[in-house]
Amino acid sequence: MKKTLLIFIPFLSLLGQSISTDQLDQLTFRNIGPSVAGGRIHDIEVLPNDPATVFIASASGGIWKSSNKGTTWKPVFDDQAVSTFGDMAISLSNPDVIYAGSGEQQNRQSTSWGNGIYKSENQGETWRSIGLEKTYHIARVIIHPENPNIVFVAALGNLWNSSKERGVYQTTNGGKNWKKVLYIDDMTGVVDMAMDKNNPNILYAATYQRMRKAWGFNGGGPGSGIYKTTDGGKTWNELTGGLPPGDKGRIGLAASKTRSNIIYATIEHADSSGFYRSGNGGRTWKRVNKLNPRPMYYSHIFVDPNNDDIVYMLATEFYRTKDAGKTFYQMPTRPTYDVGVHSDHHTLWINPNNSNHFFLAGDAGLHESWDGGVAYNRLNNIPIGQFYGIGADMEVPYNIYGGMQDNHSWMGPSATRHWLGILADDWKQVGFGDGMYQQPDPESSMLYNASQNGNIIRVDRKTGNMQGLKPFPSDSKEKYRFDWVTPLAISKHSSKKVFLGGNRLFISDNGGDSWERTEDLSSNTNRDSLTIMGVLGADIKLSKNDGTSSYGEIISISESPLWHRVIWVGTDDGNIQVSRDGGEKWEEVSGNITGIPAGSYVSRVLSSIRDRGSAYVTFDRHREGDWKPYVYRTEDYGKTWVPLTRGLPSGSVNVIAEHPDNPDVLFLGTEHAVYLSVNAGSDWTKFKSNLPTTLYDDLLIHPREKDLVLGTHGRSFWVLDDTSPLAEWSTVYNKPVHVFSVRAATLFHYWKDTSYRAQEEWAGENPPYGAIISYLVNSDVDSVTITVKRRKNQIIRTYRQPVVKGSIQRLAWDLKYPPPSSQQNESKTEGLQKPKPEDIL
């Protein structure tokens, strides 16, 4: 017998202990984009038997598939443990079989790590892990052309620590077992690999010795070189004829598709860096060109499948040679790199049946050309934006702001009246370069916009006028240091007060027109005295500290919401500094924390609403090869600290946020997921719902709407509407039935104000228009009846909803009376759970 529970909701009066993953599953997030600017892509693959089916493997946004030549895309890897990829390969003999190597190979300061290799046997629809979990970064995957069970994997290995899980691995049984067939040492992996077109027993491998730390990068060593096997990987010989002696850095490889003995390489070297060619299978080499831009991040070369004198080199710019490397010319971008083809290229797929047709991808997503690079179609319909920092204003509806990796800074609405959703046209560029933190002034049209390495501008959102605000030392002998992701904050007590973090904290009381500086708040360590791979920082020769222009600077700033004189900062060299007098004097309190090595990178500090002395701090030690989560709380200005990691799996923590209505409710953004605590961090629950696996670099709770806004580094923005039920959870979780507070709602009407748009345009999801009614049922019933009434008990609307016992459920009422019965079948009632016509009483 079915049981129904009646819930009566008087509308006008509603204006106004642990929790499980399952209890959160009915709270779904909206992916709002943008897709107008893409994210980094490392590989493009096309089904050989169906050229309409295209795959892209991204740096941190997972794997995506199109079945219609890029008109529309779908993510096919969201439910897996990682979202970062270096390479994919499709079997020529059985195109249903695809292998994907996780962990990007580009070595930058924001690189994430993978957990081995994955396999699909149904054209990428589903995937399973098949081993090599501790290789962390896989640069190349090659499948035997006649046997999909024979696979070679180039494992670059741990970027931040020594490990033996690197080299060339081979399987002969489809990934059931793996054998390491080429190994140099515990700091040298394999960054590229090529197979002879006519003889699959001949392979070339480029080994690469490199390591990154929080303070710098060493991009070369004696382990780097080129190796060759002629017996399918059983034995390997180093190729040295004509190659520069001594330490080498990153090497890129490409083999001719038409003639077996022609091999190309880009080689990073202190004196003889450049483009090399061998015409005898690698026995001897000749440098034919000095071109080799920023090899640590690029070193990508591709040979035309129909003419081996035509080679493409991908770097900040896009180059092509038609004479085997003697001359390279830069491919045109029309009319500019933003409107046409964006810079920073990482992969190329050339149609084997038509060399004029290719896909080009890199930091800004995917481009397609049908005329050999004269003109391009920019496929900006994949929402894989990589945000570093985010912000939100107080407009209605509010706007969200974010700074993207290599794709500027953007603002866009949290909701629109477009019947299609939140469109690319709704997003506006508000800054340049690599966008970082964005702070809109809540009392004016000004936006404070940070980009890489301390660049800050003030933008008038009404006029577009921009003014540079970066502080410079008056003493020419001093040089300020700023992190790549420079922290920026506006005071919670005065919108004219702005904070900017460098090695000192810079404080402005006039909107950035002038700055006061504190003492140096870092440890001020000379990184030239530190070592990477046994080499002093001062003596690094190849790609020295690439991506880390300085060390010893503030990473996070937090002013107390309760008292403007209390300020916290955390630095990349492990300092946690607190001031109780507005920045005049500082106390370094990281030494009071136990259970973590000194000097650990501080990813976030957060001053609590609980009381003036309360704060949280998170550390990120993956740059030391330590994947553990580190979260701490203090209630006495840092004198004592309590660890808060129960329930957190392996993976670094990037950000922590506190609910403005309940300090016991905390959110964490980590390298792979979002976590929630409803008991002040005593334990944590994964907030999965419909969220993808990706990097969660920043998050905020909107102070008015209480929406949770997620800034991901791989999947753009996600929004959870109205988190008020989470703030109320601890006091109502065991009630038989409860209706959570309903926030004030605005009546929106869809406006069909745009038509005749291409189907390839991606649109973000609008919120459910109307009042979001959240409720909890712990009783043993099958359904609930929800009735909305006026004060005088006049029934406005009634819904019947199925019950998911113990979970927070939602219904969106569109603020309307029910339509006439003749129109109910045509109704487009909006809601997180859209009622069926037969369920409306």
Question: What is the role of each PLM region?
Answer:
Residues A680, R790-Q794, L841:
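Short, glycine-anchored, charge-dense loop/turn motifs used at functional sites
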Residues P597-A598, I795-I840:
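Glycine-centered tight-turn motifs at strand-turn-strand junctions
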Residues S491, L720, L776-N778, D814-K816:
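Solvent-exposed residues in well-ordered beta-strands and their adjoining turns
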Residues L253, A771-S779, W813:
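Aromatic/hydrophobic beta-strand junction motif of beta-rich domains
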Residues P245, G570, E765-Y769, D780, ...:
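Solvent-exposed loop and beta-edge segments used for protein-protein assembly and interaction
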Residues M1-S20:
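Bacterial Sec-dependent N-terminal signal peptides
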Residues Q17-E761, P768-A771:
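Beta-propeller blade termini and top-face loops
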Residues I456-V459, I773-S774, D780-T798:
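Beta-strand-rich binding/interaction modules
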